[in-house]
A protein has these predicted regions:
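N-terminal helicase ATP-binding lobe
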Residues: 1-566
Length: 566
């Protein structure tokens, strides 16, 4: 107890010097110790929690009347007859939203953004809320949470073609969001989660999927015009460059952690005399057999997943559980006795990557969240980017994403998966390969070609250059000369939300105009009842389009028009 008092004294001294970040870290470590040793908080500990703004961590059983009053003052309705005490920074963000402010927030993974969204819906009771998320998996996760709380009052929409009700909560990735641009008359608040995926971090594109980046910017821009209020979220951004999509929004970087991350730079202990892979395997065995709590293992590729899984199967590593036994039995029945995932599940190990069927990934995520479920999850970036899950321990097996080294921004996102508010005060990270150099990531947003082709340039006269507008109109007139006046824009509007590249659309129109008889023969081929014969009809078409695409790359004033996929 004397040691606790000394720690509290240190926290108090640092607090008086205004060193709040260090104060929070020391206090959070102390709270983890008290939890592990099953020691109740003293009034002094509660007082320091209050002073640092970590209000939800106050122990009611040992609190005084001032702390109990504060807990009630910061308690908000988050839907489903549930009230939650927000920490100081959550409360500040919620207050700004309730006041109608447009916010772009950069905050740690452990910030607790879901509570803010749910509290806003419960308190403001808006008619139409649109939440854009990066993946279908995250849309499913958000839908389940909102359905539990708001299904009695709202129509919760996650797919296309659903009839709207007087009050709607829309939750979907950008591709589906674009299908509702014309059917939603107005939006009370547009929420873009992980909006950094729409841009570039320090000049480097976040993802290679150019089409999805363009669609996200397009969804933000077109739906944003119908929104009374906007709320954008991202982690680890230090600066938001001036851009037309966040005009009028207040950018706020929130440096407020609710968990402490203890990083072990394991790679520094490697002797250099042994095989590096062998040393990594040795440390992985140590971590899995000695550390308590759930563990996420980040790897860079499917090949690395296989290598790590093979090593784990060699270990005397078991996690007996009736639910895992049942799941492993089902996997063997469905996929065969030798299916590696079934063997791993019996050991309490799961796998998450883009090649797995989505239902298998969802089952494993839910099992990882359960106390008697999976104890460890081996994952590529698919889990880091697409699902809100975390663990007490994170093992960073590789410093690459696929074959290229990831940047500091990605590294911080992986590290941010360790620890969880209310569950693990302290998260542990084991870095098995040298991380990238620390930087201060800034975000840039710009117009993609899909948006330039779809928008009415006259509506963006203050945001596009005169030359850009002139070239857009010239291209539109050229296409209309083949199709008829106004037909090209109608066609683009219909097809772009389905992910059709505007570049290929223009090339196909040109090809059809130049070789009408060839295209008539090709289209007739679709009437063939034997699908195998379709290939011969389309082989020549595909070759000509690819050839045209390579020759017709056009650059429109810093807006490159080029095909990303076909």
């Amino acid at each position: 107890m004397t040691d606790v008092f000394e720690q509290c004294k240190l926290v108090s001294d640092l607090l008086n010097r205004g060193e709040e970040v260090e104060v929070r870290n020391i206090l959070i470590i102390l709270l983890q110790r008290l939890k592990d040793d099953n020691i109740k908080y003293t009034p002094l500990v509660n007082h320091l929690i209050r002073e640092t703004g970590l209000y939800p961590y106050i122990d009611v059983s040992t609190s005084d009347w001032q702390e109990r009053f504060l807990l009630e003052a910061f308690k908000v309705d988050v839907g489903g007859n549930q009230k939650v005490t927000l920490h100081r920074e959550q409360s500040n963000v919620l207050k700004a939203l309730l006041n109608g402010e447009d916010l772009a927030i950069s905050a740690p993974t452990s910030f607790g953004k879901s509570f803010i969204i749910d509290a806003f819906i419960a308190m403001k009771k808006p008619d139409n809320v649109v939440i854009i998320v990066p993946t279908i998996a995250l849309a499913d996760e958000t839908r389940r949470r909102l359905y539990h709380k708001f299904s009695g009052e709202y129509n919760i929409i996650t797919t296309i073609g659903v009839e709207l009700a007087p009050k709607n909560l829309f939750v979907f990735p950008q591709e589906r969001a674009l299908n509702y641009v014309d059917s939603i008359e107005y939006i009370d608040i547009l929420i873009a989660d992980e909006f950094y995926k729409a841009g570039k971090i320090q000049g480097r594109q976040i993802k290679s999927e150019d089409r999805r980046i363009g669609l996200l910017i397009e969804a933000i821009s077109l739906l944003g015009k119908k929104a009374t209020q906007r709320y954008f979220l991202a982690p680890n951004i230090t600066e938001l460059k001036e851009n037309p999509f966040t005009q009028g929004m207040q950018f706020k970087k929130v440096d407020f952690n609710t968990v402490y991350t203890d990083i072990e730079y394991t790679y520094k202990s490697f002797s250099g005399n042994q095989d590096k892979e062998l040393e990594k395997c040795g440390h992985l065995e140590r971590i899995l057999t000695t550390e308590t709590g759930k563990t996420l293992i980040y790897v860079n590729s499917h090949k690395s997943i296989h290598r790590v899984n093979t090593k784990i199967l060699e270990l005397d590593f078991n996690h007996p559980s009736s639910i895992l036994t049942s799941f492993a039995f089902w996997l063997k029945e469905s996929y065969g006795e030798d299916y590696m995932l079934a063997k791993l599940v019996q050991r309490g190990i799961g796998v998450h990557n883009g090649r797995l069927h989505r239902s298998l990934s969802q089952i494993q995520i839910r099992l990882f969240e359960k106390e008697d479920g999976l104890n460890c999850l081996v994952s590529t970036s698919s889990l880091i980017e697409g699902v809100n899950t975390s663990a007490r321990n994170v093992v960073i097996w590789s410093n690459k994403n696929s074959t290229a080294k990831y940047d500091y921004f990605t590294y911080k996102n992986i590290v941010g998966r360790s620890g969880r508010m209310f569950k693990h005060f302290v998260g542990k990270v084991f870095v098995l390969e040298e991380p990238p150099e620390e930087t201060s990531p800034s975000l840039e947003l710009d117009y993609p070609e899909t948006l330039l082709e779809r928008i009415d340039p006259t509506e963006y006269s203050g945001k596009l250059t005169d030359e850009q507008i002139a070239k857009i109109k010239q291209h539109e007139r050229e296409m209309d000369s083949f199709l008829g006046r106004g037909e090209y824009r109608k066609l683009v509007k219909e097809l772009v939300s389905q992910g059709v590249s505007n570049v290929y659309l223009s090339i196909i129109i040109n090809e059809m105009h130049k070789n009408p008889s060839k295209w008539r023969r090709t289209m007739k081929g679709l009437l063939e009842t034997n699908p195998n014969r379709w290939k011969s009809f389309f082989r020549s078409y595909y070759a000509s389009v690819k050839k045209s695409a390579s020759l017709q790359r056009a650059t429109w004033n810093n807006c490159a028009f080029y095909p990303s996929s076909i």
